[in-house]
Amino acid sequence: MAHIPVLLKEMLLQLSPQNGGIYVDATFGAGGYSKAILESADCKVYAIDRDKTVIKFYEDLNIKYPSRVKLFIEKFSNIRSILDSNSLEYLVEPSAVSKLSSIISSGIQKKNIWISASSTGVTPSNTVDGVVFDIGVSSMQLDDGDRGFSFLHDGPLDMRMDNSSHTNASTFVNALREEEIANTIYNYGGERHSRRIARAIVNARKKKTIKTTFELANIVRSVVFRGKSKIDPATRTFQAIRIWVNDELGELEKGIKAASEILNKNGKLIVVTFHSLEDRIVKTFFKSLCEPRSIDCKVFSLLNKKMIKASAEEVNANPRSRSAKLRAIQRLS
């Protein structure tokens, strides 16, 4: 299914893009947030994503909004260096997009087509009017069996958002110690049967290497029974492994902290999360900036005292939005 950006209206209402503004879409994906921001004001968007497959969506957006959007293939935790022209490693310029798209689609990577930003005149730090994050895995990634994110599609055990990384889901299930597997599945997936699952994984890999998503899902299902639950027994395990492979919580912590440091006066930071681990990180960080005892209390203000959730209408149209939570802060000085 196509990726539908969640809480889109709510994000725009909080961000309130202005003509002449500069905004960062830290999780570009299919470009839904970037497109909405560009449509709502005569502004510029710097988009970030570590997944090179999103370039095709950037290409379409750049045709419609030439010179108003740039895509950086990077981790959003590096947002400060991305906006610092002296240390940026990769920049996708409009002139390079077609060439890069064809190379990526053929499965060949050539570093020399990535253009250095050492003299691109990229906006320096502390000069953006807003940063938005839509955290987690996208529908496009889940639906592509070759990416190995989902137990609904058979494919290699991968789960990397950045396929240049050397650590993938196969590393997790075939190389980690039983205790590490159990602790990760418990801490990142909230799976109370984590030790049983870890033992089953280790026993299975003694017989042969676990290679596919279906193999792993069936191993989990063999020791965890669904009963009356509508949730597949493999759901929490797959979530935990994906978070581990991509260091999602570490990236989120570093990303939102860095984003808060590059905002102009009145600049806004908006984060949409999809599970409690992510939301807790955002809530705790925002509170640390905005509570009276914080030295940053007079610098930041919460835009909404409680998180914003999707309406019943949106949930009916896009079930993925059911667990989405939006939190936002504004820089005051």
From Swiss-Prot:
InterPro entries per UniProt:
RsmH, SAM-dep_MeTrfase_MraW_recog, SAM-dependent_MTases_sf
One molecular function GO term is: rRNA (cytosine-N4-)-methyltransferase activity
Residue numbers binding S-adenosyl-L-methionine: 31-33, 49, 76, 134, 141
- Please give the Gene3D superfamilies that the UniProt record associates with this protein: Putative methyltransferase TM0872, insert domain, Vaccinia Virus protein VP39
Q: Which domain of life is it from?
A: Bacteria
Query: Reaction catalysed?
Result: cytidine(1402) in 16S rRNA + S-adenosyl-L-methionine = N(4)-methylcytidine(1402) in 16S rRNA + S-adenosyl-L-homocysteine + H(+)
This protein's GO cellular component annotations are: cytoplasm
Q: What Pfam families is this protein classified in?
A: Methyltransf_5
List the keywords (alphabetical).
Cytoplasm, Methyltransferase, rRNA processing, S-adenosyl-L-methionine, Transferase
- Please give the biological process terms from Gene Ontology that the record holds: rRNA base methylation
**Record bears the keyword Transport:** no
EC number in record:
2.1.1.199
Q: Does the keyword Methyltransferase apply?
A: yes
User: Where does it reside?
Assistant: Cytoplasm
Family assignment from sequence similarity = Belongs to the methyltransferase superfamily. RsmH family.
Job of this protein: Specifically methylates the N4 position of cytidine in position 1402 (C1402) of 16S rRNA.
What's the name of the protein?
Ribosomal RNA small subunit methyltransferase H
Q: What is the taxonomic lineage of the source species?
A: Bacteria, Pseudomonadati, Pseudomonadota, Alphaproteobacteria, Rickettsiales
Encoding gene, per UniProt annotation:
rsmH
